[in-house]
Each structure stands twice: as C-alpha cells, then as structure tokens.
Amino acid sequence: MFPLSSHHRLLAGSRLCLRVALTALACCGVLHAGSMRFESAGTYVSNDTYYLDAFARVDLGMEPIQALVNGVELHFLVRLAVYKTRRWWIDTPILERRLRYRLDYYELTQHYRVTDAQTGKSANFRSVAAALRELGSLSRYALLPAHEINKRRQYVASIQLELDVTRLPGPLMAQAIRSSEWQLETEEFRWSLN
C-alpha cells in the first residue's frame, strides 16, 4: 500500500472533521429536519415583459447535507405557473414552466456549485449556506410578454420549489422516498399578477 501524501491526509482529516461536527450537532439537537418556504415573490413589467423576483429560505437538514458532502448531486425543481382566473370554473393555465437546478460539493477545492440546468451557467460558493441562498433566489426572470395579459382579466401567478428525490442514485432514492428528512418542498406561493 502506498503512503498517503500530506494533501490526501489533509482531505481525509477535513472530511472526518465535517462528519464529526455534523454528528455532534445532530446529537445536540442543533441540526433539525430541513424546510423550504417562500418569503417573497412578485412580478413587474419592464420593456413589455413580465419579470419575476422570488426568494425562498432553504434549509436542507442533516441527511441531504451528509449525502451532498459525500459526493451526491442534489437536484431542485422550480414550478412556475400563471393562471387566468375564472369566476365559476377552474382557473385556466396560460403558462406552466419547470426550472431545474443542481447543487454539488467539490471536496478537493472545498466549494459548493449551483448549476442552472437550462443555461448551464454555474456559480461557486465557499459555504453551503451561501449556495442555498443562491438556490432560493430567482431574480429578474423573464416570465412572459406583457401583450399576453389582458388588462381586463384577473391573473394569478404561482411558484413552488422542491428537492427532486427522483434524481438521486437508485439505492439512496429508495431510502429518500420513505424518509421525511428528504421530503422537502415549499407550499405553493400565489400572488396576483396584475
């Protein structure tokens, strides 16, 4: 067996320290089950386009964070919709969209990466808290052209965020589907578009 280099010993030591810290926090009750909730969402018109700004507070909890630092990619799904409200019938959707994001941890450089699956753009963060703030933020997202909205009708927009457990590796997915720690999603957040 080959001796470990100082770099490999440092990485192994930092991984062990992280696991010990997570276990200690869990035993003390400091770490709790994760949660997600939208704190704000709204639309505005600029240059004949409706834009969306939204912010969700995302707290993963212990099991998803442990999986993340052990190399498991976490996938998130944002559901957007705009409905034309109807007084005596079901609201009619005029826009339904799904946005996908991925969160990775890179042990060698000890950073977290958030990737937008639609554009391929990514951003790196030194802490999981900073990466989760980015995941929960949607800023100046072009929703739909203003001419598609009839000013004499009422419209409602909605947004929802969830941790997509169907994208986890097989054995972990089977466990996650049964575990409440992995069932993370926001309530549907609705607001009047006009």
Where are the predicted features?
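N-terminal onset of structured domains
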Residues: 34-74
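A short, structured loop/turn motif at beta-sheet edges
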Residues: 45-50, 106-109, 147-156
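Bacterial N-terminal signal peptides
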Residues: 14-29
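N-terminal secretory signal peptides that target proteins for export/translocation
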Residues: 1-13
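A beta-strand/beta-hairpin structural motif
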Residues: 53-56, 107, 130-145
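Short structured motifs
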Residues: 36-42, 62, 98-100, 140-145
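Glycine-rich, aromatic-bearing surface loops/beta-hairpins
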Residues: 143-194
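Structured domain cores in non-transmembrane regions
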Residues: 64-129
